[in-house]
Amino acid sequence: MARRPRAKKKERKNIETGVAHIKSTFNNTVITISDVRGNAISWSSAGTVGFKGSRKSTPFAAQLAAEKAAREAMEHGMREVAVMVKGPGAGREAAIRSLQAAGLEVSLIKDVTPIPHNGCRPPKRRRV
C-alpha cells in the first residue's frame, strides 16, 4: 500500500503588528485580522460564532466574533492592530471595543466605507 502524505502542521507565525478589517453590513459582521502585507491570520463572523438569521446583525454577535478573531491572532503573537472599518452595520463600535478588551492595542481606526460617485441604484425604500 502507498504511504499517505503527512498533513502539513499549521505553523506559528510571530507577527506583532497587523490590520483588523471589520466589515459590518446590515445582516452580518465579518472580522479579518491580517499582517501588514494583507495575508490573513485569523477571521471570524457573527455566523461562525453561532448566530443565525437576524441575530447576526446585533452588536453582541459582532463583539463575540471580534473576541474570537483577536484570540486567534494573539496566539500568533499579535499585540497591536490598525482597524479598518467598512460598512454601515450595527456591529462597528462593538467589534472595535471588544478587540481592545481582548488585549490588542488599537493604534489607528480608519473608516474605509466605499462611497459611490453616483454609481449603482440603491435598493428601494422599505414601506412598513
UniProtKB/Swiss-Prot annotation:
**Which family, according to UniProt?**
Belongs to the universal ribosomal protein uS11 family.
Q: Which GO terms describe its biological process?
A: translation
Q: What is the protein named?
A: Small ribosomal subunit protein uS11
Task: Extract the Pfam families matched here.
Answer: Ribosomal_S11 (PF00411)
Could you tell me the superkingdom of the organism this chain comes from? Bacteria
**What does the UniProt keyword field contain?**
Ribonucleoprotein, Ribosomal protein, RNA-binding, rRNA-binding
List the lineage, top down: Bacteria, Bacillati, Bacillota, Clostridia, Thermoanaerobacterales
Identify one Gene Ontology CC term for this UniProt entry.
ribosome
In Gene Ontology terms, what is one molecular function of this protein? rRNA binding
Q: What does this protein do?
A: Located on the platform of the 30S subunit, it bridges several disparate RNA helices of the 16S rRNA. Forms part of the Shine-Dalgarno cleft in the 70S ribosome.
Assembly state and interactors? Part of the 30S ribosomal subunit. Interacts with proteins S7 and S18. Binds to IF-3.
Can you name the source organism? Answer: Desulforudis audaxviator (strain MP104C)
